Amino acid sequence: MALLNNQDEIVRPVANFSPSLWGDRFHSFSLDNQVADKYAQQIETLKEQTRSLLSDAACGTTLAEKLNLIDIVERLGLAYHFEKQIEDMLDQIYKADPNFEAHDLNTLSLQFRILRQHGYNISQKIFSRFQDANGKFKESLSNDIKGLLNLYEASHVRTHGEDILEEALAFSTAHLESAAPHLKSPLSKQVTHALEQSLHKSIPRVETRYFISIYEEEEFKNDVLLRFAKLDYNLLQMLHKQELSEVSRWWKDLDFVTTLPYARDRAVECYFWTMGVYAEPQYSQARVMLAKTIAMISIVDDTFDAYGIVKELEVYTDAIQRWDISQMDRLPEYMKVSFKALLDLYEDYEKELSKDGRSDVVQYAKERMKEIVRNYFVEAKWFIEGYMPPVSEYLSNALATSTYYLLTTTSYLGVKSATKEDFEWLAKNPKILEANVTLCRVVDDIATYEVEKGRGQIATGIECYMRDYGVSTQVAMDKFQEMAEIAWKDVNEGILRPTPVSTEILTRILNLARIIDVTYKHNQDGYTHPEKVLKPHIIALLVDSIEI
C-alpha cells in the first residue's frame, strides 16, 4: 500500500506485476455449430455404448473389472454422464464385499480410494494384511508397480490418525521413485506424473486432459471410451472458450488495465480457476459468475495491498459496508471505478438469478465481500503502523483475506440446486470450509513470503510465527506445511457420509482445495506469476483441442 513521506506527499509503489500473458487472444470466439452438432451426435451414440458397458460390468464381471471401468470412466472425464449408474455400482460393490476380500494390492487400493472419494467411510485397516508384525509394508510388494501406484493414490484420501495410510504413502513413494527410471511407457509416465501430482489433489479437468493422452498408449484400451472422451473433451472445450470470451470482453470493457494499472491483469487465470471448481456443462452460469468475482476481488486486493493509503482505504471500506452507489461521491477517482464495477456486478447477479427465483442468495455473497474488505483494511493498518500481531491474531484476520470464504459462497450462486439452507450452512463456517480456508491461507503464505518480505510486509504469517516461537524461516514454513496437511485431512473427512449437505455442494469445496494444490505447486504463486505453473494448463485446456 502507499505511504506518506515527510512532506505529506503520497508515495505510491510502482506496480511490478507482469502483464497478462494472453493479450486479446480469448476476446472473440466463434463457435462452429456444424462441428459442435457433429460431435454431439456422435457423443449420444457413444454414451449409450458406454452405458451398456457399465450395465454389463455391474451384472457380470469381476470386482477388479468393475473398479477399473469406473476408474477409467472417471479419469476420462465422462462420469458426469453416468452419475447415478456409477453410484449404484459402487453401492453394489460396497454391500457385496463388506469385508474387502480382494487379495491383491492393486484392486484393494483402487476399491478403497474410489469408495472413499464417493463418501464411503472405509477403514484403513483393510491394508493391514499387507503389513508385517512391525507395521511395515512387506517388501515383497515392491515389484507390484501398479499396486504401489494405486496404494500411493489411495493414501491421499487419508484422514486424522490413519497411521497405516501414512506408512502407505512413505512406502509407495520410496519404491515408486526407485522404480520410475526403469519402467516402460505408459506406466513410467503415470508413475512420474503421480509423484508430481496425486490424483485426489489434482484439478479434475487437468487430469482428464493428461489421462486421455496416457490411455491412448494403453495396449488394452477401449476404443469406444477413448473416442467418447476425445469428442466430449473438445465439445466441452468449445463451451469453455465461449464463456472465457464473455469474461474477457467484460474485463476489457471495464478497462481496468488502463484505469487501474497497479492491479493484476489475470482474467484468463480467473476463468481457469473456475474450471477447477466445476468443468461440467451444467455449471456454465456458475463459472462465468465465479470468474468475474475472482477478477473483481483481485482488483480490490491490489487496491489495498499495492496502491491505496489508509485514509482512502478507510473510506473505501466503509463505502463497501454501506453498499450504496451514493457512497461513490466520497471516494477518490480511481476508487470510484472499482466501487461502481463491484456494485454493478452484484446487481447483475441478482437480475440473473431472479429468473429462477434465487436472487435472495446473492446477499450471502455480498456479506462475504464486505467481510473480506474489512479484513483487508485491518492488514492495511497493520502495515502502516508496523504492527506484527501474534500468529493467532494474524490467522483470525488472514483466513478471510485468503478469499476462500468469499469464493466458496460465490461458487454456489450459479448452482441451481444450491438452496438457502446450503448458504446458511456455509455461513456458519463448517469445519470443512474452515479447513479449506486454512489450506488456502497457509499455502499462500509459504508461496508469497519472500515477495511480501521484499515489499516491506512484516505482518506475514511466516514472520509472525518466527517471532512468536523464536524459530527459523524453514521451521516456520514446515509448520505451515503441517497445517496444510492437517487441513487436507479435515477436507477428506468432511466428504465422508453422513454429510449435512449434498455431494454436489461438498465437491465444490473439495475442488477449491485441489486448485490450491495445483496453483501453488512447488511453493510458487501461480496466480500472480502464471508463466511456469498455470500457462501450460491453460494452453492444454483452453487453446489446444485434442486430435480426433
Curated annotation (Swiss-Prot):
Annotated InterPro entries: Isoprenoid_synthase_dom_sf (IPR008949), Terpene_cyclase-like_1_C (IPR034741), Terpene_cyclase_plant_C1 (IPR044814), Terpene_synth_N (IPR001906), Terpene_synth_N_sf (IPR036965), Terpene_synthase-like (IPR050148), Terpene_synthase_metal-bd (IPR005630), Terpenoid_cyclase/PrenylTrfase (IPR008930)
Ligand binding (Mg(2+) 1): D301, D305
Tissue: Expressed in stem and leaf trichomes. Detected in roots, fruits and flowers.
Entry keyword annotation includes Methyltransferase: no
Gene Ontology MF annotations: carbon-oxygen lyase activity, acting on phosphates; magnesium ion binding; sesquiterpene synthase activity
Annotated Gene Ontology cellular component terms: cytoplasm
Cofactor descriptive note: Binds 3 Mg(2+) ions per subunit.
Biological process annotations from GO: diterpenoid biosynthetic process; farnesyl diphosphate catabolic process; sesquiterpene biosynthetic process
UniProt cofactor(s): Mg(2+)
Protein's UniProt keywords contain Cytoplasm: yes
Keywords assigned: Cytoplasm, Lyase, Magnesium, Metal-binding
Top-level taxonomic group: Eukaryota
EC number: 4.2.3.88, 4.2.3.-
Pathway, per record: Secondary metabolite biosynthesis; terpenoid biosynthesis
Catalytic activity: (2E,6E)-farnesyl diphosphate = viridiflorene + diphosphate
Binding, Mg(2+) 3: D444, T448, E452
UniProt short sequence motif DDXXD motif, positions renumbered to this chain: 301-305
Function comment: Sesquiterpene synthase involved in the production of viridiflorene from (E,E)-farnesyl diphosphate. Can also use (Z,Z)-FPP to make several unidentified sesquiterpenes.
Domain notes: The Asp-Asp-Xaa-Xaa-Asp/Glu (DDXXD/E) motif is important for the catalytic activity, presumably through binding to Mg(2+).
Record family assignment: Belongs to the terpene synthase family. Tpsa subfamily.
Protein name listed in UniProt: Viridiflorene synthase
Naturally occurring in which organism (per UniProt): Solanum lycopersicum
